[in-house]
Amino acid sequence: MARLKDVYQNEVVQKLRAEFNYKNIMEVPRIEKVVINMGLGEAIQNVKILDSAASELGKITGQKAVITKAKKSIASFKLREGMPIGCMVTLRRERMYEFLDRLMNVALARVRDFKGVSGKAFDGQGNYTLGIKEQLIFPEINYDEIDKIKGLNVTIVTSAKNDEEGKALLKHMGMPFRN
């Protein structure tokens, strides 16, 4: 069992039940999925960038990345509908907990001048989105093998009803929020 899942089941559930006075254990918010997205606008000119990004995302998550395509044509960006412009991975269950554990305890600690993540990046329904400026903070990525520094977005989807519950869930699980 993943370490973070064990922490959630044995510690976080009790803390949240006491904090929000939940009567039923199924009311306690939980993390449903983690979506990691890498948007690459420069993939319009060079498709090889997309292949390297997908392989790096696969190394980071342990799961094959899906290529995302443009939904609309935008003439000013020289973009046509259906052109590949990014890649994403959706993690659930064990892999999700393993990734979050590595993100919170290893990767975020490797960010330069890290003071904690913003507590304002919630969407109103208890979901949290975190932007990462470079993929080098993950230990799976070798500095010598990358051709370009790319950023990525990590969205943590929870079953929380509001931002307050979502923030409490992530805080108890070990997300390093700024004070």
Swiss-Prot record:
Domain of life: Bacteria
Keyword line: Ribonucleoprotein, Ribosomal protein, RNA-binding, rRNA-binding, tRNA-binding
Coiled-coil regions listed: none
GO MF annotation terms: rRNA binding; structural constituent of ribosome; tRNA binding
Example of a GO biological process term: translation
Pfam family name, one: Ribosomal_L5_C
Gene3D superfamilies the record matches: 3.30.1440.10
GO cellular component: ribonucleoprotein complex; ribosome
InterPro entries: Ribosomal_uL5 (IPR002132), Ribosomal_uL5_bac-type (IPR020930), Ribosomal_uL5_C (IPR031309), Ribosomal_uL5_CS (IPR020929), Ribosomal_uL5_dom_sf (IPR022803), Ribosomal_uL5_N (IPR031310)
Functional note: This is one of the proteins that bind and probably mediate the attachment of the 5S RNA into the large ribosomal subunit, where it forms part of the central protuberance. In the 70S ribosome it contacts protein S13 of the 30S subunit (bridge B1b), connecting the 2 subunits; this bridge is implicated in subunit movement. Contacts the P site tRNA; the 5S rRNA and some of its associated proteins might help stabilize positioning of ribosome-bound tRNAs.
Assembly and oligomerization: Part of the 50S ribosomal subunit; part of the 5S rRNA/L5/L18/L25 subcomplex. Contacts the 5S rRNA and the P site tRNA. Forms a bridge to the 30S subunit in the 70S ribosome.
UniProt record similarity statement: Belongs to the universal ribosomal protein uL5 family.
PANTHER family: 60S RIBOSOMAL PROTEIN L11-RELATED
Name of this protein: Large ribosomal subunit protein uL5
Organism expressing this protein natively: Trichlorobacter lovleyi (strain ATCC BAA-1151 / DSM 17278 / SZ) (Geobacter lovleyi)
Organism taxonomic ancestry: Bacteria, Pseudomonadati, Thermodesulfobacteriota, Desulfuromonadia, Geobacterales
